[in-house]
Amino acid sequence: MWIIEAEGDILKGKSRILFPGTYIVGRNVSDDSSHIQVISKSISKRHARFTILTPSEKDYFTGGPCEFEVKDLDTKFGTKVNEKVVGQNGDSYKEKDLKIQLGKCPFTINAYWRSMCIQFDNPEMLSQWASNLNLLGIPTGLRDSDATTHFVMNRQAGSSITVGTMYAFLKKTVIIDDSYLQYLSTVKESVIEDASLMPDALECFKNIIKNNDQFPSSPEDCINSLEGFSCAMLNTSSESHHLLELLGLRISTFMSLGDIDKELISKTDFVVLNNAVYDSEKISFPEGIFCLTIEQLWKIIIERNSRELISKEIERLKYATASNSTPQKIIQPQRHIQKNIVDDLFSVKKPLPCSPKSKRVKTLENLSIMDFVQPKQMFGKEPEGYLSNQSNNGSAQNKKSGDNSEKTKNSLKSSSKKSANTGSGQGKTKVEYVSYNSVDKGNSSPFKPLELNVVGEKKANAEVDSLPSENVQESEDDKAFEENRRLRNLGSVEYIRIMSSEKSNANSRHTSKYYSGRKNFKKFQKKASQKAPLQAFLSLSEHKKTEVFDQDDTDLEPVPRLMSKVESIPAGASSDKSGKSSISKKSSNSFKELSPKTNNDEDDEFNDLKFHF
């Protein structure tokens, strides 16, 4: 703002503040907001006109004065500024000191610029006070500049000290609040005649420091208080950088979170972060690095022993890191190891899942025979009656399924004994499924391993699908259900037991030329002569050679090309919806017709053991 004063008594011995506006200077005018009276008979009644322009945005950063325009009002002796005559149209001046001589007046008027640039910490407060302060000739802004003389602190309830306030305190800027601005606007009329009535901002600053415990006692106690320490910081604010420089720190900056140089940070004593970017989940620093925000650092600075506090914290973190450090586990890449597929399939130690892509986890309590007979289909709808037991069923459902499975087991055991007795007497060919109950109930595995049961052996937990009575008539619904019930090739192994009558055992020597090369042929032949009718297990390769079953390629997809799929139940077998299969007399005759076609027309009593994948 511009202030004028003069030697002698031409201005009544007072200094006056010139706010932006127009003033008429003469000996016959009154002193008010638009006139300046000069007591001298050597000047005209209306001698000159002074005009003060409002400050510009550039003036806030330069601290330069507002334009001072002087125009002579056609006087006899004219007007001089800095010993130069003012032109007829007037002249404007940007100097900070002006010496104005009016006509033949023996005294000069001295005009000088008092710089006052106010910085705001809050944009809302800036928009509220900017226009009023500009009318007083005071430039305002948000950014720090070398010309800033006053800093308006935000004193809202619950607000903490900001980085701008810290920096303003350390560089000895006068800190004020909105109460000072209100008082400044009310004394405008009174300070026109006497500039000494201008409110003192230092008194306001002292009151703020005295009543606020977030400030140190003086800026001198904080400047260079951390000299000798080094820190790293994110280069987001110039005020933060200047603040740390005033504290005496050696600063290493990184431009962004992705540009963090851990080797550079490991050489520093601590890391300083702004609150705006502080996020422990996004920023990861090496162990033993002391990280803190600027607000936390300022709280340490307030204490008189700030150097000792920081040194102790750094030593504590380094000691904790050295004592608790454990080598990080290096994750080795998994190498592909070839496994013996046969051992994985037939080993009792490694249970097989129901299907290769199945993610269902079944407990032993929810496990039933139907789960193995009818696995979930990969494509199409599930067959009716299929039990899909999930692992998250309630205890009531588990109990109910357990009771049903017990009833099914008892019925299967009784029917199995009857079918075995009738089959051996009448010479029927019987098909049985492999028992899946070889896993103990205490086993924690959700899948049961597959196991072969030799006919004639008695096991405590054996489960065999029984053959229903021959009087059951096959209906169209049963045939449709049977077609949907048959196993699809989802990667599990299926065993079908082929038993022949004692009469057909006599002809086994004629068919030995097809199976004598098998390793287990003599073993099964020996067991069959002692305990039960002869059994044979035909592999997939032998099945292709003998052409026992017709290949149906329509049902092979999406089965892997290295495997093949055959029907789980021979033609002629019927089943009801409870999962029980039966073979009539007609089916036994048709089953014998499936023997290999040779010149001797020999029967194939051994049928096949089919491997499904």
Curated annotation (Swiss-Prot):
<feature type="compositionally biased region" description="Polar residues">
    <location>
        <begin position="387"/>
        <end position="399"/>
    </location>
</feature>
<dbReference type="GO" id="GO:0140463">
    <property type="term" value="F:chromatin-protein adaptor activity"/>
</dbReference>
<feature type="compositionally biased region" description="Low complexity">
    <location>
        <begin position="574"/>
        <end position="592"/>
    </location>
</feature>
<keyword id="KW-0779">Telomere</keyword>
<keyword id="KW-0234">DNA repair</keyword>
<dbReference type="InterPro" id="IPR008984">
    <property type="entry name" value="SMAD_FHA_dom_sf"/>
</dbReference>
<keyword id="KW-0227">DNA damage</keyword>
<dbReference type="Pfam" id="PF00498">
    <property type="entry name" value="FHA"/>
</dbReference>
<dbReference type="GO" id="GO:0003684">
    <property type="term" value="F:damaged DNA binding"/>
</dbReference>
<protein>
    <recommendedName>
        <fullName>DNA repair and telomere maintenance protein nbs1</fullName>
    </recommendedName>
</protein>
<dbReference type="GO" id="GO:0031573">
    <property type="term" value="P:mitotic intra-S DNA damage checkpoint signaling"/>
</dbReference>
<feature type="region of interest" description="Disordered">
    <location>
        <begin position="546"/>
        <end position="613"/>
    </location>
</feature>
<dbReference type="GO" id="GO:0140031">
    <property type="term" value="F:phosphorylation-dependent protein binding"/>
</dbReference>
<feature type="domain" description="BRCT 2">
    <location>
        <begin position="228"/>
        <end position="302"/>
    </location>
</feature>
<dbReference type="GO" id="GO:0000722">
    <property type="term" value="P:telomere maintenance via recombination"/>
</dbReference>
<dbReference type="InterPro" id="IPR040227">
    <property type="entry name" value="Nibrin-rel"/>
</dbReference>
<keyword id="KW-0539">Nucleus</keyword>
<feature type="region of interest" description="Disordered">
    <location>
        <begin position="381"/>
        <end position="428"/>
    </location>
</feature>
<dbReference type="InterPro" id="IPR000253">
    <property type="entry name" value="FHA_dom"/>
</dbReference>
<keyword id="KW-0158">Chromosome</keyword>
<dbReference type="GO" id="GO:0030870">
    <property type="term" value="C:Mre11 complex"/>
</dbReference>
<keyword id="KW-0597">Phosphoprotein</keyword>
<dbReference type="GO" id="GO:0035861">
    <property type="term" value="C:site of double-strand break"/>
</dbReference>
<comment type="similarity">
    <text>Belongs to the Nibrin family.</text>
</comment>
<comment type="function">
    <text>Component of the MRN complex, which plays a central role in double-strand break (DSB) repair, DNA recombination, maintenance of telomere integrity and meiosis. The MRN complex is involved in the repair of DNA double-strand breaks (DSBs) via homologous recombination (HR), an error-free mechanism which primarily occurs during S and G2 phases. The complex (1) mediates the end resection of damaged DNA, which generates proper single-stranded DNA, a key initial steps in HR, and is (2) required for the recruitment of other repair factors and efficient activation of tel1/atm upon DNA damage.</text>
</comment>
<dbReference type="InterPro" id="IPR036420">
    <property type="entry name" value="BRCT_dom_sf"/>
</dbReference>
<comment type="subunit">
    <text>Component of the MRN complex composed of two heterodimers rad32 and rad50 associated with a single nbs1. Interacts with (phosphorylated) ctp1/CtIP. Interacts (via FxF/Y motif) with tel1/atm.</text>
</comment>
<dbReference type="GO" id="GO:0006302">
    <property type="term" value="P:double-strand break repair"/>
</dbReference>
<dbReference type="GO" id="GO:0000729">
    <property type="term" value="P:DNA double-strand break processing"/>
</dbReference>
<dbReference type="GO" id="GO:0007095">
    <property type="term" value="P:mitotic G2 DNA damage checkpoint signaling"/>
</dbReference>
<dbReference type="GO" id="GO:0140445">
    <property type="term" value="C:chromosome, telomeric repeat region"/>
</dbReference>
<dbReference type="GO" id="GO:0006303">
    <property type="term" value="P:double-strand break repair via nonhomologous end joining"/>
</dbReference>
<dbReference type="GO" id="GO:0060090">
    <property type="term" value="F:molecular adaptor activity"/>
</dbReference>
<feature type="domain" description="FHA">
    <location>
        <begin position="23"/>
        <end position="86"/>
    </location>
</feature>
<feature type="short sequence motif" description="FxF/Y motif">
    <location>
        <begin position="611"/>
        <end position="613"/>
    </location>
</feature>
<dbReference type="GO" id="GO:0006281">
    <property type="term" value="P:DNA repair"/>
</dbReference>
<dbReference type="GO" id="GO:0005634">
    <property type="term" value="C:nucleus"/>
</dbReference>
<dbReference type="GO" id="GO:0000723">
    <property type="term" value="P:telomere maintenance"/>
</dbReference>
<feature type="modified residue" description="Phosphoserine">
    <location>
        <position position="355"/>
    </location>
</feature>
<feature type="domain" description="BRCT 1">
    <location>
        <begin position="107"/>
        <end position="186"/>
    </location>
</feature>
<feature type="compositionally biased region" description="Basic and acidic residues">
    <location>
        <begin position="400"/>
        <end position="409"/>
    </location>
</feature>
<dbReference type="GO" id="GO:0000724">
    <property type="term" value="P:double-strand break repair via homologous recombination"/>
</dbReference>
